[in-house]
Amino acid sequence: MKTNSEELTVFVQVVESGSFSRAAEQLAMANSAVSRIVKRLEEKLGVNLLNRTTRQLSLTEEGAQYFRRAQRILQEMAAAETEMLAVHEIPQGVLRVDSAMPMVLHLLAPLATKFNERYPHIRLSLVSSEGYINLIERKVDIALRAGELDDSGLRARHLFDSRFRVIASPEYLAKHGTPQSAEELAGHQCLGFTEPGSLNTWAVLDAQGNPYKISPHFTASSGEILRSLCLSGCGIACLSDFLVDNDIAEGKLIPLLAEQTSDKTHPFNAVYYSDKAVNLRLRVFLDFLVEELGNNLCG
C-alpha cells in the first residue's frame, strides 16, 4: 500500500501543531480521524513515527527523518499547484497579521488603504502582540518582529533596518536640562521597558564605549506607551526611529546624545511558516511590505 498525500498532510500538521487535537482543528477533521490516519501511515511504513505521552508528542528518530521529507514533498506539491493557478488567480481571502502595537500603528495602519486599493479581495486582520507567539496556536499567517530569527521552523523576509533614537520632549528638557553624556542620564527620569530587560541597555555609549544601562523611573510593556510618556514630558526614552521620526520632524520630541549614540541597526522581519510561502495573498503582502517599507524607511 502506497502513502497518499492526505496521510502526509495529516502527519505534518500533527507535528507542526504539537497535538492531534490542534491538528484536527486546523484540518477541520475529527480527532479520531487524525489519529487513525497517522496510525495507518505508521503501519504502512512499519515504524513508529511519534512518541505518544499523555502530555505531549515527540518525533522518533525515524519520524524526524520522515517529517523532513514529507514537509518538503508537500511544499513542492503546493508550489507546483500554485504555479499552475497563479496566472489566473486573484489574491483573495483573509490574511491574519500579528505585530507589536507600534508597528501596527506607525507602519501597517498607514499602509492599509493603499494595500486595499491594490488588492481589494484580500481582507487584512491586524492583531497586536508584544512578544513572540506560536503562529499556529494564534491562527496567524504572518508576524512582524524585530531581531534575528531563532525558530528554525520559520522563514523570514527582511523588511527594513532601524536605528535607536534617544529623545525627550522640549517641556521635559526645559524643566530638567539636557544631558550631555550617557553618564548624565543617571540624573534624569529615564523611561524603560518592563521586559525584556535587554531593551533598557541603550544604544548611547558611555565614556568607555559601552552601551549605557539605565535604571528606569517609569516602565511600560510597549514602545507606544513609552512614546506617549515621552511626549507628555515624563522623561527620556530610547526608541526605534520609525516610532519617533515624525515627532522629531514636528518638533514634539528632541533627539539627544546623537554623537554618542551607536549607529548600529537592528533588523525587522516578516516571519511565517515555510508551508505558507506559496500562499498567493501572503506572497503579495510580503512584496508590498518590502516595496513600501524598504523604500520609505532608511533607518
Curated annotation (Swiss-Prot):
Keyword Transcription regulation in annotation: yes
DNA-binding region: 20-39
Pfam family, one: LysR_substrate
DNA-binding keyword on record: yes
A single BP term in Gene Ontology: DNA-templated transcription
Inducing factors: Expression is transiently induced upon contact with target cells. Negatively autoregulated.
Coiled coil (residue ranges): none
Disruption phenotype: Inactivation of the gene provokes a dramatic reduction in bacterial adhesion to epithelial cells. The mutant is unable to undergo intimate adhesion to epithelial cells or to provoke effacing of microvilli on infected cells.
Domain of life of the organism encoding this protein: Bacteria
Keywords from the UniProt entry: DNA-binding, Repressor, Transcription, Transcription regulation, Virulence
Residues covered by the HTH lysR-type domain: 1-60
Gene3D superfamilies, A to Z: Periplasmic binding protein-like II (3.40.190.10), Winged helix-like DNA-binding domain superfamily/Winged helix DNA-binding domain (1.10.10.10)
Recorded GO MF terms: DNA-binding transcription factor activity; sequence-specific DNA binding
InterPro entries documented for this protein: CrgA-like_PBP2, LysR_subst-bd, Tscrpt_reg_HTH_LysR, WH-like_DNA-bd_sf, WH_DNA-bd_sf, YafC/CrgA
Domain remark text: The N-terminal region is directly involved in DNA binding through a helix-turn-helix motif. The C-terminal region is also involved in DNA binding, probably by permitting the oligomerization of the protein. The C-terminal region interacts with RNA polymerase.
Protein family per UniProt: Belongs to the LysR transcriptional regulatory family.
Subunit structure: Forms oligomers. Oligomerization is required for DNA binding.
Functional note: Involved in the regulation of bacterial adhesion to host epithelial cells. May play a central regulatory role in meningococcal adhesion, particularly in switching from initial adhesion to intimate adhesion by downregulating the bacterial surface structures that hinder this adhesion. During intimate adhesion, negatively regulates the expression of pilC1, encoding a pilus-associated protein, pilE, encoding the pilin, and sia genes, encoding the capsule. Also negatively regulates its own expression. May also regulate other genes that are involved in intimate adhesion.
Annotated protein name in UniProt: HTH-type transcriptional regulator CrgA
Origin species: Neisseria meningitidis serogroup C (strain 8013)
Gene: crgA
